């Protein structure tokens, strides 16, 4: 039995990671423009260490019933050249396109991110229903957003929590039930994303095993989780509300 267990573990480790979604499949869902005005939306935050990339994603349901999505990244302003060299991409191009924001100095300015989030309703003409976040590095920001009148929900980045949203996002893309506007940085994040399986065979995006930055994909999965719970499953009680 021990031999079989060890043998199975070896096999399992051999197929531990796999590509999440092919970029070519994601690109099939690209549209020229999304009409956000009047939509109810859910936000997902992935606030990593202040020296690393952070991301905010917004999702909702379009008039055609498809999931509509937008995602932006935040990086330390004084580390642009360093990150360009290390990651072999041009962050200045993404900043010019409005899909990435450089803030702070050597570290990301959380206050900038908080202000950005608080301006989303006015900028897009949407109504923010909920904001999902992971407790790690985000508790202070979540409390500030709560004080500003937003409903924030802690969404643990565990496979047992996010596997359903991970699957929904994948299936929505593969079935062309997903739309996003031109966003090269998001596509790069999807290209970097690698998945693993938990002991219960729950599939999840594995940051440590991924081939580069995946913060935009992770924040989108968190937002999709809220959308799934509220719209597709109709559940009202979930997560841990902060307040």
Regions found by a protein language model. Give the residues of each.
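Short, surface-exposed amphipathic charged segments that create phosphate/polyanion-binding patches used
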Residues: 166-175
């Amino acid at each position: 039995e021990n031999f079989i267990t060890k043998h199975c573990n070896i096999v399992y480790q051999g197929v531990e990671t796999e590509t999440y979604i092919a970029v070519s499949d994601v690109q099939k869902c690209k549209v020229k423009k999304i009409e956000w005005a009047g939509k109810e939306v859910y936000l997902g935050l992935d606030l990593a260490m202040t020296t690393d990339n952070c991301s905010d994603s917004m999702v909702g349901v379009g008039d055609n019933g498809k999931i509509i999505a937008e995602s932006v990244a935040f990086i330390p302003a004084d580390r642009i050249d360093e990150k360009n060299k290390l990651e072999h991409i041009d962050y200045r191009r993404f900043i010019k396109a409005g899909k990435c924001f450089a803030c702070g100095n050597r570290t990301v300015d959380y206050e900038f991110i908080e202000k950005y989030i608080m301006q989303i309703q006015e900028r897009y003409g949407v109504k923010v229903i909920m904001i999902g976040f992971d407790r790690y590095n985000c508790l202070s920001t979540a409390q500030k957003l709560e004080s500003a009148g937003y409903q924030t929900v802690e969404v643990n980045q565990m496979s047992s929590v996010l596997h359903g949203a991970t699957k929904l996002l994948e299936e929505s893309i593969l079935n062309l039930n997903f739309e996003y506007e031109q966003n090269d940085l998001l596509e790069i994040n999807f290209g970097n994303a690698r998945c693993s399986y938990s002991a219960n065979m729950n599939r999840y995006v594995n940051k440590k095993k991924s081939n580069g930055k995946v913060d935009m994909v992770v924040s989108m999965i968190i937002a999709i989780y809220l959308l799934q719970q509220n719209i597709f499953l109709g559940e009202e009680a979930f997560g841990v509300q902060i307040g």
